[in-house]
Structure formats: structure tokens, C-alpha cells
Amino acid sequence: FNKGQQEVVLNNFYDDEKPIAITLNPSLTPSQNAQKYFSKYQKLTTAVNHVNEQIRQTHAENEYLETIETQIQLSDPQDLEEIKDELSESGYLKRKQSLKNKKKKVSKPHRFRSTDGTSILVGKNNLQNDQLTLKTAKKTDTWLHAKNIPGSHVIIENNNPSEETILEAANIAAYYSKFQNSANVPVDYVAVKQIRKPNGAKPGFVIYEGQK
């Protein structure tokens, strides 16, 4: 096409029977018209990417706050204090400067014993979850979590637990989750060495692979 044209009709790669008519600026050369549309495409692509990133961040934020809500429902007074500390550190809650600067030790997770005597540990808040999974547990221990919903990190202190212990730990993971009152709560379990925490992730958030 040439300078001065107001429109050009091009083939439609998605439908041969419906060619596309593109409006042109007759004062611009073909190259300038093409550059104009390319610049517009780049701006739209950038805008779409920005919106998608905002959606991703909002989704992650909602998941995090759902986790906090679940933990509050299951918490005791000590857990509530740690949840307050976490929310303060994350910028969701304002606390007095003296309390903010005071370094607190993360409380210990709950400990259970399975029928065969195996130790099972449960984090009751995100600070406990991080401490338990990333620092306390051995790489060979077994980690459990309710599948795709907010819940506690559960650790079986054994690299080859019995099926009975896995089932009992799974029941604990289901109880300490958003769906604790549901009759059927799927639970993932995997070796701790398969767990990792992404850079910049919020407390309690981890990713894993190879789950059963």
C-alpha cells in the first residue's frame, strides 16, 4: 500500500473468508503507519502484562489472608500474638514501636504421637510453619498439607512412615485446614527436601513437587 491510502485490506490468518480492514493515516508512509500500530501493540501488551501481574498479586494476597483467617479460627492466645507479629511485619497491622522492635521467639509447634509412636509436628501459624518446615524438620522427614487450601504445615519425623502414621498425619493436616469440617479433604505429602520457599514469598508460603 502507498502513502495517502486511508485503509488497507489484509489476509486474516485465523479466517481466510474474513479479511481484515485496517484504517491508515493518509499523511503517514506505510512504514510510519506500521510503526504506529506496532507502538500501540507494545503499549497494549505492556498494559495487559501489568493487569495480569496485578491479578496474580491480588490472588496471592487473597490466599494469604484466607490462610490468616483459618489460623485465627484455630489459634490459642500464644498463636494470636504471633499472628499479630506477622501481620505487623507484613504491614497489615500497626503496633506500638516498643512491641515492634522487641524480638520474639517463635513458639514451638504442636506435637502429636501416632499410634505406632512416630512424632508428628504441626505449625499453628505461618511463623511456626516456616520455622518447622524450613529450619526444624530434617530433609528426609515427611511433609503434609491440605491440598490447594489454607492450612498448617505438618511434619512426620520419619523418612519412611507407616501407612497408618501417614493417614493419621493426613487427618491432622485436614483438621488444621480451612476445610476442617469437611468429610473429605485431599492432603498432599512429600519429603521435606522437595519443599522450597520462593524469594520474597509471604510467611508460610512454599512450593513443592513430587507429592503423593
Descriptions of predicted regions:
Residues 1-212:
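Extended, highly charged segments
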